[in-house]
Structures are given as structure tokens and as C-alpha cells.
Amino acid sequence: MSLRLITWDVKDTLLRVRVPVGQQYYAEAKKRGLCVNPGTLETSFRNAYRSHSRLFPNYGLAQGMSSRQWWLDVVLQTFRLSGIEDSDTVQSLAKQLYQDFSTAHNWALVPGAREALDSCTNLGLRMAVISNFDRRLEELLRQCCLERYFDFVVTAESAGVAKPHLGIFHKALSLAKVPPHQAVHVGDDYVNDYCAARMVGMHSYLIHPKTPPKLQWNIPEEHVIQSPEQLIPKLVGVLKNSMT
């Protein structure tokens, strides 16, 4: 194939939270004199996130919500489920946590991510982002010194649909003016990244640090990488084959 575009997922593909969410919520609550177990907060967060994603998909855009309000509600529900009712203290805490997760301080590069992006740049490949993140992503990428690698960023909020909806991939391909068979998508989610990209006609690779994924999914072993930098030899091979 002739390769012209690489699109990347972000969370747990290029960036990951520096400290588990429950620990971060606990630390902020402790500053305000609230006593709650970090493990309880972690479980409550997962339940609140899952519930809000089901009731108000894609940050509640169809229901007229903003992504900021969606996240504030998730935080409030997390503390309710942990036995702490709403108060001015929790409202203030929620706003602080929303702001904290907007900054590079709470995020770390996935090992091998920058090396992979540098290598793709050196290979002359265009790159973009397709992510289910919200409107904070571009600023976060800027703070993490990653924005320079990408021609554009497509988020679920800006596209109006979230992965695995094919519309978000079509939007990226349209912006790049590249046909799907000349594009590769890389991400850590089997359904949202690997399968959805292939359904639209793109090539895709799954980042899966644990082995063996073939026991879980029907996926060729050569389509699985354990870190972003493992993508590069595969791309080099594709580029060499396209020139012969």
C-alpha cells in the first residue's frame, strides 16, 4: 500500500494519567478535609463514568450539555457513590479536578510515544489525532509538547460522534484529503480503534502491552504492538514494499 497518513488515539496510546484517578481524587479531597478511601473513589469513578457514558453519550452533546458540565457531574456522582453528598466543598473540588486534568501535570507520556512520533516525522509521514477526548485535548497536547507532530486533531466533541462511530474517522480522512486505504490508525482499544478503523477501510494496529491478545480477539499477531515505537519497523516495511 501507499502510506500517506498516520492517525493516533491519545489516552493510553500516547498519554496516560500519571496517578490513578482514585488517588488523585483522594489527594484533592484530603486537602479539603474530606475523608474517603482512594480505592472506593476509584470504583465509584468507574461506575459514575460508565453510567454517564450510557445516559449522556459523547459528553451529553445531544442533550445540550457541555463537556465541562458532564465531567463535573461525573465527579459529583463519584463522591456521592463514595458516601459524600454534594456541598460547596465538593463543587469546588470538582471544578479543581476538571482543571487539573486539563494540564500536563496530571499526564505522562506512554513509553516510546515520543520516539515513535519523531520516527514518523523523519519518515515524512503526515500525522493526526482521532480521540474520544473532549475540547481540552489540543491545549493538553500543546502543554505536553506534542501538538507540533499533528496536522490536525479530531475529538469526539468536535466531530459530534465518538469512536467507534465511523463518522469520526471519515471526518479525519476528509480533513487530510487521504483515501482510507492510504491511512493507518493506531490505538489501544480493540473495538474503538482497531475494528472501527478497519471498518472504514483504514489499516490499523492495536497497542496492547499484555500478551497474548490473540487469545481474546480474532486479530492477526502482526497487527499487535506492545508500545508505540514498535510501530516503526512495520511502517518502514510497508514503505519499502510500496517502492518496489
From Swiss-Prot:
<dbReference type="GO" id="GO:0005634">
    <property type="term" value="C:nucleus"/>
</dbReference>
<comment type="similarity">
    <text>Belongs to the HAD-like hydrolase superfamily.</text>
</comment>
<dbReference type="InterPro" id="IPR023214">
    <property type="entry name" value="HAD_sf"/>
</dbReference>
<dbReference type="InterPro" id="IPR036412">
    <property type="entry name" value="HAD-like_sf"/>
</dbReference>
<dbReference type="Pfam" id="PF00702">
    <property type="entry name" value="Hydrolase"/>
</dbReference>
<protein>
    <recommendedName>
        <fullName>Haloacid dehalogenase-like hydrolase domain-containing protein 3</fullName>
    </recommendedName>
</protein>
<dbReference type="InterPro" id="IPR011949">
    <property type="entry name" value="HAD-SF_hydro_IA_REG-2-like"/>
</dbReference>
<dbReference type="InterPro" id="IPR006439">
    <property type="entry name" value="HAD-SF_hydro_IA"/>
</dbReference>
<dbReference type="InterPro" id="IPR044924">
    <property type="entry name" value="HAD-SF_hydro_IA_REG-2-like_cap"/>
</dbReference>
<dbReference type="InterPro" id="IPR051828">
    <property type="entry name" value="HAD-like_hydrolase_domain"/>
</dbReference>
